[in-house]
Amino acid sequence: MAVRFSFYYAAIFLAVGIHLPFWPAWLKYRGLDAAEISLILSVSVWIRAFANPLIAHFADRSGAHKKVIMISAGGGVITYALFGIADGFWALFVVNLLASAMFMALIPLGENLASRASVEHKFDYGRVRLWGSITFILAAYIGGWVVERSGDEAILWMIIAAMVAAFVAGFSLPRRPARDRPSVRFPAFVLLRQKSFLVFIAAVSLLQSSHAVLYVFGTIHWREAGLPDD
């Protein structure tokens, strides 16, 4: 079981390791300016904030975590493939909304399955999760090497290949039974009434916002400073 989740984490963070540093560069390659790139990537975060809880709520109620992961990964392959034919800001904007909702749901859904499975099957969650971090580092390095030699066009194809790997890895994940129905219809709303949770959300928001400029313009800035992708 630990090997299955290690493979899943490796596949997911293969995609993240390419997407995080190089996706803004691909959008610039497609002719978008700094304001358009910022808008597309910032709206992606808001989409995740609303889509992920809804997707997770459905998975918990139905017990279809694996099925939802497979649909999200398959949807990720399709939506990222659509980037290849999308032309212009608004087409890229709409496709990016769909891709963000699909792609980023894979991480919390996988975390949920892995944390529960680590207790039931008695494996070390940290060692399993480690493979995601290792793959992220390797993906960023190897991705830079490929982009330096093949150009920005290769970025999209590497992400699509990584999403295919995530789809394949999803087949090996265990199925989970549906949870008992809670006493309230949307348990997440209960958290929003807790002061400590709101403070936590505020702290995480500030942490994420401090990374935003680096995530969006880091690679572009380093290129303009004369640093190679590899």
Task: Write out the residue ranges for each language-model feature.
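Cytoplasmic helix-loop-helix junction between adjacent transmembrane helices
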Residues: V95-W131
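Helix-to-loop junctions at the C-terminal end of transmembrane segments
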Residues: F50-A64, V147-E148
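Residue-level signature of mid-helix packing/kink "hotspots" within the transmembrane helices
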Residues: V45-P53, F136-I137, Y141
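Helix-loop junctions at membrane interfaces in 12-TM secondary transporters
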Residues: A2, F83-N96
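Structural signature of the two symmetry-related core transmembrane helices
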Residues: K67-A81, I160
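Helix-loop boundary and gating motifs at the non-cytosolic
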Residues: M1-V45, A49, F197-D230
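Juxtamembrane intracellular "pre-TM" segments in multi-pass secondary transporters
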Residues: G170-Q208
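C-terminal membrane-cytosol helix-exit motif in multi-pass small-molecule transporters
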Residues: L106, G143-E148, I155-R179
